[in-house]
A protein has these predicted regions:
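DNA-contacting surface of Y-family translesion DNA polymerases
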Residues: 2-58, 80-82
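Enzymes and membrane/adaptor proteins characterized by extended Gly/Ser/Thr/Asp/Glu-rich
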Residues: 37-59, 63-157
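Short coil/turn connectors at secondary-structure junctions
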Residues: 15-16, 67-69, 123, 167-170
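Phosphate/pyrophosphate-binding betaalpha-module
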Residues: 157, 162-171
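Short, structured coil/loop segments at alpha-helix boundaries
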Residues: 8, 29-30, 103, 139, ...
Length: 171
């Protein structure tokens, strides 16, 4: 059930429209469910929120009892940055590996399959891929999360990745 914040409370309403709060644990806390019911439009999930695909599906269903159109966001890049397989490591190649192979059809298919798995669990927004160009090989944050150092390669693979996610119904 969606109950928007009071019409006169524009600050709260505006905040609920743009924030994507996270939380600790594998079930949604009462404060989060209350805010989703009041109009919070999105929730961000991380590895600490996921024990298994089945548990994740139950969590997203729990959120949707308060608001059926809530965006459930996650950072699922494959490779070193995984949430679905956080306990054992990703079975999918990361962006740097995909860029090294430089096959956009493969990148699209990997992203489509990741998107399919996310959608099965009720996740409808992926914060991936990292569209950064790895212009500094010593950058500890981007590194293997980038498709590579070439701007055109990174652009091609970013577009293919987004197409794959969207084909699975994930933004």
């Amino acid at each position: 059930m969606t109950v928007l914040a009071h019409r006169t409370d524009t600050v709260t309403r505006d905040a609920l429209a743009v924030l994507q709060p996270g939380f600790e644990g594998t079930t949604a806390p009462a404060w989060l469910l209350r805010r989703v019911g009041e109009g919070l439009t999105a929730v961000g999930l991380f590895g600490r929120n996921i024990a298994s695909p089945e548990q994740l599906a139950a969590l997203t269903a729990q959120l949707r009892t308060e608001r059926d159109d809530v965006l459930v966001a996650i950072d699922e890049e494959g490779g070193d940055v995984t949430r679905l397989e956080v306990r054992g490591g990703s079975s999918f190649p990361g962006n740097l590996a995909l860029g090294a192979v430089d096959d956009t059809a493969l990148t699209r298919e990997v992203a489509r399959e990741l998107g399919r798995r996310l959608a099965e669990c009720g996740v409808n927004l992926n914060w991936a891929p990292s569209a950064d160009v790895n212009s500094n090989p010593d950058n500890p944050v981007i590194g293997v999360r980038s498709f590579g150092a070439d701007t055109h390669l990174a652009a091609r693979h970013t577009a293919a990745y987004v197409e794959g996610l969207q084909a699975a119904g994930v933004a």
